[in-house]
Every structure is written in structure tokens, then in C-alpha cells.
Amino acid sequence: MYYGFDMGGTKIELGVFDENLQRIWHKRVPTPCEDYPQLLQILRDLTEEADTYCGVQGSVGIGIPGLPNADDGTVFTANVPSAMGQPLQADLSRLIQREVRIDNDANCFALSEAWDPEFRTYPTVLGLILGTGVGGGLIVNGSIVSGRNHITGEFGHFRLPVDALDILGADIPRVPCGCGHRGCIENYISGRGFEWMYSHFYQHTLPATDIIAHYAAGEPKAVAHVERFMDVLAVCLGNLLTMLDPHLVVVGGGLSNFEKIYQELPKRLPAHLLRVARLPRIEKARYGDSGGVRGAAFLHLAEK
């Protein structure tokens, strides 16, 4: 049995998956904001409850919104203050008497998609999240590529490419990013960036859902905006594809529901790739909000 925890700032969700990778049980509880011992107790209680339900001890994986392991074995997760700077992996492993694995929630999303029965046939899978920010994960032969600092999937913090400046104008503001730099692509091609870009060019603020509705109705500003956005997205993704050369790209996050992405990217990407490059398959994520739990559960499976 495989147990996956998706640990966020407001809730902890546990999903239990059987040997056929089907979810058979799940539970949600509030996340304790400041109390680390309480957090450990909740995770222990949920694990033991799952053991009782399954009649066996399952493997345990946890996805967190942050960096899973610093050099000193602690986690960096500002959205879960009770775990910030704590040796969560070591402490919980000791409490439940089995190895616990922890990874970034975006990596868990990518792992979940890569272990889809159909997608599993692709050796290299790029999971790309276009949500409030931009992130994701790289999966090679069913396992996460983490890198030395566990930041391999922090795609949103690449700077705007030169070709994007040709589209947006050289005077486009280099928007300050939460990482401390300016001009990171997540400020332009995320859901938030989609809205910011519309506001910048038209001095009018609209939510993404309204912009997309206006686009569908043929409103000229919205049409021009979507065309511009798709061009910038193709430039940025083209750089990623040239560096990583995946067989499959799976798109998640709020903007993944904008079906125009899957129609337009295959048309626009070739201009930004090497001439010898073949386009990867580009698909919408299949597991939605359950992807984090599913991927966390498969952190052990990926090592088999």
C-alpha cells in the first residue's frame, strides 16, 4: 500500500493507493499552523488509521509547498509554519517506524502524471504548472530529478528571454518577483501574469476567466491579448524544451483549463526550437487536485 500526504497551509490530505495504483481511501484534516508536535501527532494518527484500514503498513510519502531537505535535514516551507525549519522526515520516520520520503508538491504533481498508465510509456516527462505562479517537475524513467538544491522544477524563475521582449516591447516592466529578482517568467505566463499583462496593455483589470470569456466572444482586446500571451508562452516553453528535450509535457494549474493552449502551442513552438527538434506531446493534466496526493504516494514506487 502507498500512502500519500499533500500538506498545505490549511489542510492535510491523505490518500491510500493499492498495488494497482488505485485510490481506495482518503481523509482530510486541518493543518496545525504553529504547533510542530501537534503536526507530527496528526501525521502519525492518520498513518496508523490507514494501517488499520488496510491491515498492513503502507509506505509514506509527503508533498510540501517548499524545499524538502536542506543540508541539515530540515524542511523549508513558509506556507506551513509548524514544519518550517524542522527535521520532519527524520522525526516522522522515527515515530511511525518506517522510512518517510518528502518532496516538493510540484514534483509530486509531475510524478503523478508520469505514472499515468498511458504516460508511463514516455521516458522523460515535463510537468508544467501554470497557476498563481509557474513551476513543475522533471521525471526521467519514472523518478524525480531534484538537483543538488531540490530546485530543478523552479522553471518560473528563469528570466524573460530576448524573444519575449521582442513581443512585449523592450520597455516592458521587469516585474519584481517573490524570489528577490526581477523579470522572472512566472510574472508573465502564470495565471496571475496573464491578468497582469492584460492590465498593463489596456489599463483595465479583469480576472482571467473574464478575459477568456471575452476572447471566446471575439472581443478585439481580449483576442489581441491572448495572441500575445500565446506567443510569449511559446517562447518561454521553447527554451525549456531545448534545454530538457522531454518526450511529453503535461500542463496543470488554473490556466491548463484554457483549451486554446493545446491548439496554439504546437503551431507556435517550432519557430523557437532547433530545426532538428521534434515537438513533444503536450497534454492537459489528468489528475487535477488529486495529483499532489497521488504523486506523494508514489515517491516510494518511483525508486523500485
Swiss-Prot record:
Binding site for ATP: 4-11, 133-140
Family: Belongs to the ROK (NagC/XylR) family. NagK subfamily.
Known pathway: Cell wall biogenesis; peptidoglycan recycling
Keyword terms of this UniProt record: ATP-binding, Carbohydrate metabolism, Kinase, Metal-binding, Nucleotide-binding, Transferase, Zinc
EC identifiers of the protein: 2.7.1.59
UniProt function note: Catalyzes the phosphorylation of N-acetyl-D-glucosamine (GlcNAc) derived from cell-wall degradation, yielding GlcNAc-6-P.
InterPro entries: ATPase_NBD (IPR043129), N-acetyl-D-glucosamine_kinase (IPR023505), ROK (IPR000600), ROK_cs (IPR049874)
GO biological process terms, semicolon-separated: N-acetylglucosamine metabolic process; peptidoglycan turnover
Name of the protein in its database record: N-acetyl-D-glucosamine kinase
Molecular function terms from GO: ATP binding; N-acetylglucosamine kinase activity; zinc ion binding
Alphabetical list of NCBIfam families matching this protein: PRK13310.1, PRK13311.1
PANTHER family the record matches: N-ACETYL-D-GLUCOSAMINE KINASE, ROK (REPRESSOR, ORF, KINASE) FAMILY
Residues the entry annotates as binding Zn(2+): H157, C177, C179, C184
Catalysed reactions, as listed in the record: N-acetyl-D-glucosamine + ATP = N-acetyl-D-glucosamine 6-phosphate + ADP + H(+)
Native source species: Yersinia pseudotuberculosis serotype O:3 (strain YPIII)
Alphabetized HAMAP family for the sequence: GlcNAc_kinase (MF_01271)
Enzyme class: transferase
